[in-house]
Design a protein with these regions (language model features):
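Phosphate-ester processing/binding pockets and catalytic centers
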Residues: 1-232
């Protein structure tokens, strides 16, 4: 009489949820360069830790957590950030800001290129700067999710409706058709959704992402980083 020992079912590892917040450079501020960047963070870290810390930072330095952090306005001490004209207050804010960012378990991916070189190389065949960079971010985000056993969501700042529609089209084409690196089934298993949030909705993730592209361009150009944001 034979003996059969039933094997224990193999438990699948639970996937971790990640959010990638995406923002781009202001074309008038970076000259020939275009940069699209994404900040990747665990959903649990974002919702349970980071949001509260940034809101407390805003309340401490600007008196309200409803203020939307904006890199260009802060750099030029405009509107809600005129208080940063005071060197002491400015230094204290950025020191506190950097101290929040340093311990974060985040990953940053960026795609940048010289617009003029792109046009010179591809001429009339060149597609939009945003579309080229977005496809690169998609590939790298899926690679990250695959390596970290994650599910991913992308959140972007809403632009014109037709521009949002173009990005949605690129996103779903990528999901359905796959790429040279990943089959469609792998992409769909990892990449779950794309969302758009309007600028004044006070999304903490997008406010942090707003600092990244300009910082990347500063690194490329070798510009000074007085508050060591590049090192965080």
């Amino acid at each position: 009489m034979g003996y059969y020992k039933q094997k224990k079912p193999i438990k699948k590892k639970t996937k971790t949820e990640y959010i990638m917040f995406v923002d781009e450079t202001d074309p008038t501020a970076t000259g020939d360069y275009f940069c699209l960047s994404g900040i990747i963070i665990k959903r649990s870290d974002y919702e349970n830790d980071l949001v509260d810390k940034i809101n407390n930072l805003k309340k401490t330095h600007f008196g309200s957590c409803d203020i939307v952090l904006h890199y260009t306005e802060m750099k030029n001490n405009r509107n809600n950030f005129k208080i940063l004209k005071d060197a002491v207050k400015r230094n204290k804010f950025y020191m506190d800001f950097v101290n929040i960012l340093k311990p974060l378990d985040i990953t940053i991916i960026s795609s940048y290129f010289n617009r003029n070189n792109m046009k010179a190389t591809y001429g009339k065949c060149a597609v939009s700067d945003y579309d080229v960079a977005f496809k690169t971010l998609l590939e790298n985000f899926v690679h990250f999710l695959k390596n970290n056993n994650g599910d991913g969501m992308i959140i972007m700042e809403s632009r014109l409706f037709n521009e949002n529609a173009n990005l949605q089209n690129t996103f779903y084409q990528y999901l359905n058709n796959g790429s040279e690196l990943f089959q469609s089934s792998i992409i769909k298993y990892r990449l779950k959704c794309l969302g758009f949030i309007v600028k004044n909705d006070n999304c903490i993730g997008l406010q942090l992402a707003d600092f990244v592209p300009a910082t990347i361009i500063r690194i490329i150009k070798g510009a000074q980083d007085k508050f060591s944001i590049q090192k965080t």
